[in-house]
Amino acid sequence: MAGKKVLLVYAHQEPKSFNGSMKQVAVEELSKQGCTVTVSDLYTMNFEPRATRNDVTGALSNPEVFKYGIEAYEAYKKKALTSDILEEQRKVQEADLVIFQFPLYWFSVPAILKGWMDRVLCQGFAFDVPGFYDSGFLKDKLALLSFTTGGTAEMYTKAGVNGDFRYFLWPLQHGTLHFCGFKVLAPQISFGPEVSSEEQRKVMLASWVQRLKSIWKEEPIHCTPSWYFQG
């Protein structure tokens, strides 16, 4: 939709990967719609995943005992976080939709993306106490997880060896994104591209493009336990 701004946080080492293709077709389709698309290519950026005292540029509030959450909160209020964090926060703040594109690692995100979440979505910027879940500071924004798996779709069902995929989305979609206020759209899951045929991979890409054509009309999922653990 013309005028909309999208941040695509991309976490894969190889541009020629299937994740790279998913990222590229998303950029192309959203740009065709008139959206302004910004990509944070975390590996290319050599993004620092570790949350350390180096994230604070000024004096610590307690130099004797370092507590990252408290120090990041105080530093955010004083605009004393490092420039890489502030830049990513600026991108998030400007975005109407944030898409995370990544391969599933151990039922979660790659370490570099986990580090992005740890460092960027800090207290004061993304949430406060009170000021989380439906009252989170990013409540006017949409978020979507688009990821690939190593296994087939059948493996991520209730009867499958990995269980229903919604189980492992609970901490990511609910405990992270919804906690910060995001309205979470249904995930885009590309099951087993490495074990799929070229034709099947083309279908996955086409399905993603087709979905993006009407992405602004989608309703968020109900971020309640019933979505993840019932049905």
UniProtKB/Swiss-Prot annotation:
<keyword id="KW-0963">Cytoplasm</keyword>
<feature type="binding site">
    <location>
        <begin position="148"/>
        <end position="151"/>
    </location>
    <ligand>
        <name>FAD</name>
    </ligand>
</feature>
<dbReference type="Pfam" id="PF02525">
    <property type="entry name" value="Flavodoxin_2"/>
</dbReference>
<keyword id="KW-0597">Phosphoprotein</keyword>
<dbReference type="GO" id="GO:0071949">
    <property type="term" value="F:FAD binding"/>
</dbReference>
<feature type="modified residue" description="Phosphoserine">
    <location>
        <position position="197"/>
    </location>
</feature>
<feature type="binding site">
    <location>
        <position position="174"/>
    </location>
    <ligand>
        <name>Zn(2+)</name>
    </ligand>
</feature>
<dbReference type="GO" id="GO:2000379">
    <property type="term" value="P:positive regulation of reactive oxygen species metabolic process"/>
</dbReference>
<dbReference type="GO" id="GO:0016491">
    <property type="term" value="F:oxidoreductase activity"/>
</dbReference>
<dbReference type="GO" id="GO:0009055">
    <property type="term" value="F:electron transfer activity"/>
</dbReference>
<feature type="binding site">
    <location>
        <begin position="18"/>
        <end position="21"/>
    </location>
    <ligand>
        <name>FAD</name>
    </ligand>
</feature>
<dbReference type="InterPro" id="IPR003680">
    <property type="entry name" value="Flavodoxin_fold"/>
</dbReference>
<dbReference type="GO" id="GO:0031404">
    <property type="term" value="F:chloride ion binding"/>
</dbReference>
<comment type="similarity">
    <text>Belongs to the NAD(P)H dehydrogenase (quinone) family.</text>
</comment>
<dbReference type="GO" id="GO:0016661">
    <property type="term" value="F:oxidoreductase activity, acting on other nitrogenous compounds as donors"/>
</dbReference>
<keyword id="KW-0560">Oxidoreductase</keyword>
<keyword id="KW-0862">Zinc</keyword>
<dbReference type="GO" id="GO:0042803">
    <property type="term" value="F:protein homodimerization activity"/>
</dbReference>
<feature type="binding site">
    <location>
        <begin position="127"/>
        <end position="129"/>
    </location>
    <ligand>
        <name>substrate</name>
    </ligand>
</feature>
<feature type="binding site">
    <location>
        <position position="223"/>
    </location>
    <ligand>
        <name>Zn(2+)</name>
    </ligand>
</feature>
<comment type="subunit">
    <text>Homodimer.</text>
</comment>
<feature type="binding site">
    <location>
        <position position="178"/>
    </location>
    <ligand>
        <name>Zn(2+)</name>
    </ligand>
</feature>
<dbReference type="GO" id="GO:1901662">
    <property type="term" value="P:quinone catabolic process"/>
</dbReference>
<dbReference type="GO" id="GO:0043525">
    <property type="term" value="P:positive regulation of neuron apoptotic process"/>
</dbReference>
<feature type="binding site">
    <location>
        <begin position="104"/>
        <end position="107"/>
    </location>
    <ligand>
        <name>FAD</name>
    </ligand>
</feature>
<dbReference type="GO" id="GO:1905594">
    <property type="term" value="F:resveratrol binding"/>
</dbReference>
<dbReference type="GO" id="GO:0005829">
    <property type="term" value="C:cytosol"/>
</dbReference>
<feature type="binding site">
    <location>
        <position position="194"/>
    </location>
    <ligand>
        <name>FAD</name>
    </ligand>
</feature>
<feature type="binding site">
    <location>
        <position position="201"/>
    </location>
    <ligand>
        <name>FAD</name>
    </ligand>
</feature>
<keyword id="KW-0479">Metal-binding</keyword>
<dbReference type="GO" id="GO:0007613">
    <property type="term" value="P:memory"/>
</dbReference>
<dbReference type="GO" id="GO:0001512">
    <property type="term" value="F:dihydronicotinamide riboside quinone reductase activity"/>
</dbReference>
<feature type="binding site">
    <location>
        <position position="156"/>
    </location>
    <ligand>
        <name>FAD</name>
    </ligand>
</feature>
<feature type="binding site">
    <location>
        <position position="12"/>
    </location>
    <ligand>
        <name>FAD</name>
    </ligand>
</feature>
<protein>
    <recommendedName>
        <fullName>Ribosyldihydronicotinamide dehydrogenase [quinone]</fullName>
        <ecNumber>1.10.5.1</ecNumber>
    </recommendedName>
</protein>
<dbReference type="GO" id="GO:1904707">
    <property type="term" value="P:positive regulation of vascular associated smooth muscle cell proliferation"/>
</dbReference>
<dbReference type="GO" id="GO:0008270">
    <property type="term" value="F:zinc ion binding"/>
</dbReference>
<comment type="function">
    <text>The enzyme apparently serves as a quinone reductase in connection with conjugation reactions of hydroquinones involved in detoxification pathways as well as in biosynthetic processes such as the vitamin K-dependent gamma-carboxylation of glutamate residues in prothrombin synthesis.</text>
</comment>
<keyword id="KW-0285">Flavoprotein</keyword>
<dbReference type="InterPro" id="IPR051545">
    <property type="entry name" value="NAD(P)H_dehydrogenase_qn"/>
</dbReference>
<dbReference type="GO" id="GO:0070374">
    <property type="term" value="P:positive regulation of ERK1 and ERK2 cascade"/>
</dbReference>
<keyword id="KW-0274">FAD</keyword>
